[in-house]
Amino acid sequence: MPNLLEKTRKITSILQRSVDSLETELPYNTMASRLADIIDCNACIINGGGSLLGYAMKYKTNTDRVEEFFETRQFPDAYVKAASRVYDTEANLSVENELTIFPVESKDIYPDGLTTIAPIYGGGMRLGTLIIWRNDNEFSDDDLVLVEISSTVVGIQLLNLQTENLEETIRKQTAVNMAINTLSYSEMKAVAAILSELDGNEGRLTASVIADRIGITRSVIVNALRKLESAGIIESRSLGMKGTYLKVINEGIFDKLKEF
């Protein structure tokens, strides 16, 4: 039977795995699943807004109403607010506690159900909550040590991802600003007209038609597109007689054009 050290190593080894994006569907399923296996419980991880980041169900404990929270990947506001007021791990909460994960309609079915809540911090900020639960049997001190470690590991990953996302946002904003600064007034006018022709972030356009409509030469449009493409703002592909296919890959250009 694995001892506490071996269990800890299994959890901390997750730090060696990368979570590419918080936009990924349920990016923390691996952590929740590993914790559920090691501690023998159900587990889920939510962010500060109550969105589900990952979960693992070893045992059936919930009704259809609660299962819907997991299907929609969003916990109720009332529960999220109550959980956000937990600043240290709250262990072995009974089915009568407001933080129990067991639904009120199943209290008689699981009278000995126990829930443990652990806040997730990173860089001094509250980033989310780790929730584990069992139908019976209290969580031991060893279990709670693993919960604390797990919440720390998730906190580190969340903080790193937020930092990476911020750096990527700054990089894109800088690229847009630099590209805009190279455009003449006529080219800016052309870019605004071009992007308004797109269906969302991509579409087909004919430079000569746009040039005639806004009263500029076709070469101005071509130069503007070339500058945006070299800056990594757009991708384009000639369609021959049908015009040009255009795709915006840095959406910051739309916000910048609102200032034009």
Swiss-Prot record:
CDD domains: HTH_ARSR. Residues 207-226 bind DNA. It is found in: Cytoplasm. Residues 1-159 are annotated as: GAF domain. GO terms for molecular function: DNA binding; DNA-binding transcription factor activity; GTP binding. One of its GO terms (cellular component) is cytoplasm. Keywords: Cytoplasm, DNA-binding, Repressor, Transcription, Transcription regulation. Belongs to the CodY family. HAMAP family: HTH_type_CodY. NCBIfam families: codY_Gpos, PRK04158.1. This is Global transcriptional regulator CodY. The gene is codY.
